[in-house]
Design a protein with these regions (language model features):
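Short linear motifs in low-complexity or flexible loops
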Residues: 12, 22-27, 37
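Short hydrophobic alpha-helical segments enriched in small aliphatic residues
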Residues: 8, 31-34
Length: 370
């Protein structure tokens, strides 16, 4: 692989090998969605840490099976899944409000040249964005709310899908040269995708619900490492705690590991406008997504954020918590969570759960049953 950003990689090792980054006053604990006047940069400000050390590191099927075996040993009741109803993972991911962070997570994933090129060349993101949305959430929600066997089958299915995703970068992007080879099982890209999902979920949650305590945030991050194992990422290679995780994100956002190409810019604009789908994207959602993006990527994606957009995002932050608080549980909680609740009560998923599942995962029940 022809990689031009090796100076960033040589600084690797500290955070991902268990060393803490330097902490300062600007942490996620002090900011997030209800204090976004700094437009996304404060979300991970004043932190510095290394990025993944080895761009040639890959996930093997043997490693994935080791992670699955390790998780399986910790599961007490397989019917409850790998997290269970008392976990903070269920508490956060049951909220439909997490959709508020989906655009942000998607754009930050597109900021990784390997991920963006893989999505462009191997997915239906542009032609069938709803199908892509459903395929992503089918896997993620099954890992979270399915039974343990379902979660493990989802992990193996995802791995098999990733084995077929290879190619070359068509142009120079950030620290990568044209012709550089990518594979979906490369650890740095998988780690970045995982990180965007975890961070964006908390940002979205706190847009409409009370801010998580530092203890809860730490617990959520700790539990998230279990799901990382289902991606094939060894938990002990991840930052050891939430503060270090912030530091890793900060380093990534400032590094040449990330960069936006013309093609990924087009993909991002299509996502934010709902092009190719029957679902219109509200202006307020576009504005809020733009606001909670780090300023570097607002610029690189070519997203305008003038006074009108700022006002739109500000209004959304004011009314969203009030509207969300009035939603009945059937609308507030995602279908996969409702299905899991029914399963634990030894009942079939009800009509509302099935309809909600159709929206979130494109089918009435979680997949990967025997």
């Amino acid at each position: 692989m022809n990689f031009r950003g090796n100076h960033d990689l040589r600084r690797a090792g500290g955070i991902l090998q268990g060393q803490r980054g330097t902490k300062s006053s600007g942490t996620l604990e002090n900011t997030l969605c209800d204090n976004l006047s700094e437009k996304g940069d404060h979300l991970i400000s004043h932190m510095a840490s290394p990025v993944p050390a080895d761009p040639s590191a890959f996930v093997s099927s043997q490693e994935l099976e080791r992670h699955i075996a390790s998780i399986e040993q910790q599961v007490e009741r397989p019917i409850e899944g790998i997290f269970g109803p008392n976990s903070i993972t269920w508490r956060i991911n049951r909220e439909s409000a997490l959709f508020l962070g989906a655009g942000r997570a998607a754009l930050l994933q597109l900021a990784h040249p390997w991920v963006a090129t893989a999505l462009d060349q191997h997915s239906s993101l542009l032609s069938k964005p709803i199908a892509r949305f459903h395929s992503t959430f089918r896997v993620v929600f099954t890992m979270i709310f399915g039974t343990a066997p379902q979660a493990f089958r989802a992990a193996r299915s995802l791995y098999q899908t990733h084995t077929r995703i290879t190619g070359q970068l068509p142009t120079d992007v950030a620290g990568y040269a044209a012709g550089s080879r990518y594979e979906a099982l490369q650890m740095p890209a998988l780690t970045w995708v995982y990180a965007t999902l975890i961070e964006s979920a908390i940002i979205a949650y706190e847009c409409v619900l009370p801010r998580l305590t530092p203890t809860d945030r730490e617990a959520y991050y700790t539990e998230s490492k279990i799901m990382a194992g289902l991606f094939g990422i060894a938990p002990d290679t991840l930052p050891p705690d939430w503060t270090s995780f912030q530091a890793y994100i900060r380093q990534m956002l400032e590094s040449q590991e990330l960069g936006v190409s013309d093609r990924s810019r087009i993909m991002a604009h299509r996502i934010l406008t709902g092009a190719g789908s029957w679902v219109p994207i509200p202006r307020w959602y576009q504005s809020l997504t733009t606001e909670i993006l780090p300023s570097r990527f607002r610029t690189e994606f070519g997203l305008s954020f003038g006074e009108a957009r700022m006002a739109s995002a500000e209004r959304a932050r004011r009314w969203l918590p009030h509207v969300y608080a009035t939603l009945p549980a059937a609308m507030r909680y995602v279908g996969p969570f409702q299905e899991a609740q029914a399963r634990l009560a030894n009942k079939p998923a009800g009509f509302i759960a099935r309809r909600s599942n159709k929206f979130w995962i494109g089918q009435p029940l979680l997949p990967f049953n025997e």
